[in-house]
Amino acid sequence: MNDFAKTIPYQKAGISPDGLNASIEPVVLNPSKEMALRKRPAVIVCAGGGYEFLSDRETQPVAMRFASNGINAFILRYSVRVKFPTALLELAAAVKYVRENAERFDIDPEKILVCGFSAGGHLSASLATLWNSSYLAQFLDNPE
């Protein structure tokens, strides 16, 4: 299990982490000297694939485009072929991970967004509507 996956509270949600392989890949360009004093926004990109597979052609080019425009990007490789709420929990944990590592990645922790395509878009929209729910808060130790 990778370091990011170790931060996901699967057991709190009654999910066995066995066989799950969520990971997060930073696509962060070194800031120019002019940008040294400015924290950057961040985006977490979620691929589509019908929750059956992850389409890399949808994530890498998009993350690179964000990064080339001064937005630190992260590619979330969420678990597929799993029951709800596994992928949602992984995305929520990814936002928490990026926020907790904001200093390390020169990120403004108040400017983190998510985007996705197809299933990844559904996942992003689900988080957008449930992010402050008691449902996710109980798993992520966040106050409502």
Question: What residue spans do the PLM features occupy?
Answer:
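N-terminal cap/lid segment of alpha/beta-hydrolase-fold proteins
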Residues: M1-R38, P85
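Primarily recognizes the serine-hydrolase "nucleophile elbow" in alpha/beta-hydrolase
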Residues: A93-E144
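Short amphipathic alpha-helix adjacent to the substrate-entry channel of hydrolases
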Residues: L37, S55-F74
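Catalytic nucleophile-loop/oxyanion-hole region of alpha/beta-hydrolase
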Residues: S55-D56, I75-P109
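Short beta-strand element of the alpha/beta-hydrolase
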Residues: K39-G48
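Active-site-proximal beta-strand/loop segments in catalytic clefts of secreted hydrolases
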Residues: C46-A47, L76-S79, F117, L127-A128
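N-terminal cap/recognition module
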Residues: Y51-E52
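A fold-wide structural signal in alpha/beta-hydrolase
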Residues: A42, A67-R77, L113
